[in-house]
Amino acid sequence: MNVAAFIEYLNKTKGLQIDASYYAKIEKWRQWWQGYVPSVHNIKITREDGEHKRRRASLRMPKRVCEDWANLLLNDKTTFQIGDAKSAAYLLGSDEQQTGGLLRQLHFWENANKLVEQAYWSGTGAFVLSVEGLTVDAAGNALPSPQGRIQLDYDPACCILPISVERGVVTEAAFVSECVMGGKPAVYLQTHTCKGGERTITNEWFEVMDDVSGTPKFAKAKTPPGMVEHITVTGAPAWFSLFSPAVAKNIDGGMGLGMSVFSEALDAAQMADYAFDNYRQDLRLGGKKIFYDRSMCKKWVDKDGVEHAVPPDAVHRQIFYELPAPEGSIDQPAAWREYNPDLRTEDNHRAVQDALDMMSFKCGLGCHRYSFELGKVATATEYTGSRQDLVQNANKNQIPIETALIGILRAILWAAKNLLVADVDPDTSISVNWDDSYIVSEQERTAQLREDALAGLVPRCRYLSARYGLSEDEAHQWAAEAKADSQTDEQLTFGGA
């Protein structure tokens, strides 16, 4: 979607002054995330028969970096601690693994993990709340609607249009997305504004038409059946929550938006692709070659009278190359020689590894996040040289994500109580329990917990729960059975054999 063209349309028709130039930078980050930047990955080759194009091979490291950050920050071991039991059950379900409740219906954890990846390539991510099946009065005020359904959208920066920003916090925003209406492309715009304690969510649709200039044109479309143009709620928190990588932006423009986690590592990403492409080309062109004289070959003539030489081995034709006939007497033997190009694997490996180390360092993952030694990948839990850098950066990046998570959960609880008439408490305490296995591996943690349990520093049921994935009740039962068995053995052996 051409977001810049749509922003220009909104600026003209609504009197806004949204900076469209910043979205060109977001588009450049998107290209790197997808692994194809035309100015970098298109190679022109000039031959005797004209110009040819070749696409440079890419490791697509920007996407891998964003995936790794998402897996570190928001994964299956991330949990919520909610003070009110009814609110916790409503959101998370009644089991200790937090695999039920509304968040399961919304596929929250899977989508939130993907949103972190999207936010880290685009610079900003947004959780956006909406409620379907609402009842509204003639003025558009939302009324209690037990039949309503809470929904969440997950938008990257290219879909976020900040309208009001106060002290670096986006208080009003619009969210744009592509859709299809009547089989034709369209744009859906949802605008969140606040005035005097009232929040208004406005829904608009626009038709997209092609123009001879190549720039799309937009026209206001009718509201689809079953949809309202706007709703108003009073006393609600913001129905959206934004977060960005925890770095200070050194790029002008885009107020309210962050910058990509790899925006300062584009040169390193380019170096990685250059090194990898060179490695690949050396392997592709490094096959055995045999140069021979045409006089060594059988000849055949096609229907046009053109003579062709049959190479010594037609099956492996690609290794044979013709040489000009040798000068001298006709009795001189035919010339041929074998050539085995140097693949330069060590040099190429070192170049790729250096580029990966620079990329890892510039993206805050430490110096050796991606280390290939003896054919084995050494991950973050297998090296200690720069783990401290990763720990510090991960702790810093948890802060904005935690703020966004708590903000959207409070908005969900508010809508559940005031609109869906659910028995929940929007003001309950909420905290996030982060997975810190990137600091200490699960095996190391379990081994340490076992030693502490044997030393009597922690209850043995705590170790059993961590080691075997038991619930608290099951762990207590196992510990009691183990204690009873040990006492029985002592009684049986009391007094000797």
PLM regions with names:
Residues 1-171, 494-497:
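Extended, helix-rich architectural segments
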Residues 27, 44, 50, 132, ...:
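Charge-rich, acidic-biased intrinsically disordered regions
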Residues 90-93, 98, 300, 324-444, ...:
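Surface-exposed loop-to-helix/strand elements on domain peripheries
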Residues 115-116, 129-130, 283-291, 369-374, ...:
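Short coil/turn segments at secondary-structure boundaries
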Residues 121, 126-259:
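Extended, regular secondary-structure scaffolds
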Residues 223-385:
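Extended, charged amphipathic alpha-helical segments
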Residues 448-497:
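Activation/maturation switch segments at domain boundaries
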